[in-house]
Regions:
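PLP-dependent class I/II
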Residues: 1-208
């Protein structure tokens, strides 16, 4: 079986794929009889007024035949701030796929214990509590991103910055402020060996 993999809230560009684009891709999947797989780790971190973009926003009226073709990759690492736990889920509206995946990974995988506790705790939350959490996360990241962009422009006049529509990534373009012989590889090597940043009187390694 074949499929198309999409990332509606992109890492590392911060671009948000429109729902209309996802619907058009879904039509191709129906026409070609293939799966539509979507990495939705950042689904609820969006900054546009259009809301989240997701394969689960597609109705059978929008794309006849889409039911039973969708698989989403879910994770607690992003929206739930649990990057080290490495736990998530595959969600599908295809019963056969669900049964096969459950059989395969029950035998082959076991998530870490603390990750299971966290994921289990999320399952006990009400819909309203989860929606409130998503809203608080968007507000937090929106403020942080706006502040970061402002400070970067102040400290590095001429730098080109993207403004994310979703996820938590900003693309920095240094072409207007670096010399013509600037070597990216050497800069990254320097940062990994010597780079550090001071935050609240403590120094941290600068990773790019």
């Amino acid at each position: 079986p074949n499929g198309i993999l999409i990332i509606p809230a992109d890492n590392p560009t911060g671009l948000q794929m429109s729902q209309n684009t996802i619907n058009e891709i879904a039509k191709i999947c129906v026409e070609e009889d293939i799966w539509l797989v979507s990495d939705e780790a950042y689904r609820n971190i969006y900054f546009s007024g259009s809301g989240p973009s997701s394969i689960w926003q597609i109705s059978n009226t929008d794309v006849p035949g889409i039911l039973g073709r969708r698989i989403s990759i879910e994770s607690v690492s992003k929206v739930w701030n649990a990057c080290g736990l490495r736990i998530g889920a595959l969600v599908t509206d295809n019963k056969m796929m669900y049964q096969k995946v459950r059989s395969e990974y029950t035998a082959n995988l076991c998530a870490n214990v603390i990750g299971q506790y966290v994921f289990g705790a999320v399952a006990q939350m009400s819909s309203d509590e989860i929606i409130d959490w998503y809203s608080s996360q968007r507000a937090y990241y929106s403020k942080a991103i706006t502040s970061l962009i402002k400070e970067l422009k102040k400290e590095l006049p001429g730098i080109i910055l993207s403004s994310p529509g979703a996820a938590i990534y900003i693309v920095l373009d240094f072409k207007n402020i670096t010399p013509s012989d600037f070597n990216v590889s050497k800069f990254i090597e320097y940062c990994s060996l010597n780079g550090k940043i001071r935050i609240k009187k403590k120094y941290y390694t600068l990773l790019l």
